[in-house]
Amino acid sequence: MLTTLPKVSPNSMVARVLLSFLATAGFFYVNIMPALVDGLRQSLGFSNKKAGLVGSCNVYGAACGAFLIAFLIRHINWRLTAHWLLVGLIAMDLASMWARSPYALMSVRFSHGFIGGMLVGLSDSIFARTIAPDRTFGVLLLVQVLLGGFGVMTLPLFVPKLGINILFATLVAFSVTTLLMLQFLPEYPVQHQSGAKTDGSQIPKVKLLLGLFSVFLFQAANMGLFAFIIGLGKSYGLALAFVSETVGIADWIAIVGALLVIVVSTRFGLTKPIIIGMLLAFIGTAAFRYSDVKWIWIAANVSTGIAWNFVISHLLGMCARFDTAGQTAVWSGFASKMGLASGPMLASFMLGAGNYSLLIATALVLLTGATLSSAIPAWALDRVSNAVSSTQSSTTSPAGVTS
């Protein structure tokens, strides 16, 4: 029966939206991480440390799942695999409703993350089979920011009345919806390339490692702060309703960062946009020290959100440019997830006594490290790009004909 359902055009905007939901289903808990961490504290009485570790286990599982799927992607039926992975996510979210001890929940959420990481990696491979995959990734970012902002804005308000299970029920509903959407996606066969050198022997490993390290540090800095952003706001005397609303709206405004990536593209290279974005992230993060002033709290959330979307897109794109076979793109995704997991874990050890000032200072140190690590690979890639452009310009006909 399912095979008789009409399929959307593989490269249409509708298909890109459906694919974005497929990828988001495996990682949506990250977009609502502040609601999840604060919900564990409010509903189950977890400490900052234990709530943060639950979130970290979730993302560490995703990193492991994404790592594994990279080796399996060419040997599996993506549609059948996606069905089973979505069913697995639903099962793990249902199991999370029954887990009440921190360590039981860490185990269940690690398993959930592992399954979700495989689904995200699978979805990313399908993105690469579309025409203009960058557009699909752009749609993905918009979907995640819009839904994540709405979730952070509304879900924390339901936790005091309905408990933590409202969050897991939301994740179940999202996976069920995605399972229905999956039926309308067309086939995306693997594109076999000939003559491509994929052994990685020509990749400048030191520059790549610096690029991957910058991704790791940047994601750790931002997610370490973002996971506890609700608690940070409340520690400065801000009301929960105000904190949730402003964080959610800031997430929506942060779409500007994603749109700027599309507009700017590579016309200014990598180095300048990354440095400018890092500077904005640094200033916004430092401003959280004055969160008792409401307009500064709002400005800090907006600026860091815009910078996060803007910079991470450039960092991932930078790593992907080191080869054309997609190997470095897989590794950058792995580094990203490791950073997203490590940030909340590191933060959880700092907040035993509610020391949010130390958390902010640590985020600033990590951002500085990310800036320095990204400078050399970005500059090197810009030099190569400029050299290629100069060569092409010198061989272009006076009429300026391009292929």
Predicted regions and their residues:
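Conserved MFS/SLC helix-loop-helix module at the cytosolic interface between two early adjacent transmembrane helices
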Residues: C64-S101
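A late C-terminal transmembrane helix in Major Facilitator Superfamily
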Residues: F322-Y356
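Helix-loop-helix hairpin linking two adjacent transmembrane segments in secondary transporters
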Residues: A104, T130-E187
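Helix-to-loop junctions at the C-terminal end of transmembrane segments
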Residues: G65-W78, G257-L270, L351
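C-terminal transmembrane helical hairpin of 12-TM major facilitator-type secondary transporters
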Residues: G269-L315
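Extracytoplasmic gate region of multi-pass secondary transporters
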Residues: M33-P34, K207-G248, W252-I255
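Cytoplasmic helix-loop-helix junction between adjacent transmembrane helices
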Residues: V108-V143
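Intracellular juxtamembrane helix-capping segments at the cytosolic ends
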Residues: M118-I131, N309-D323
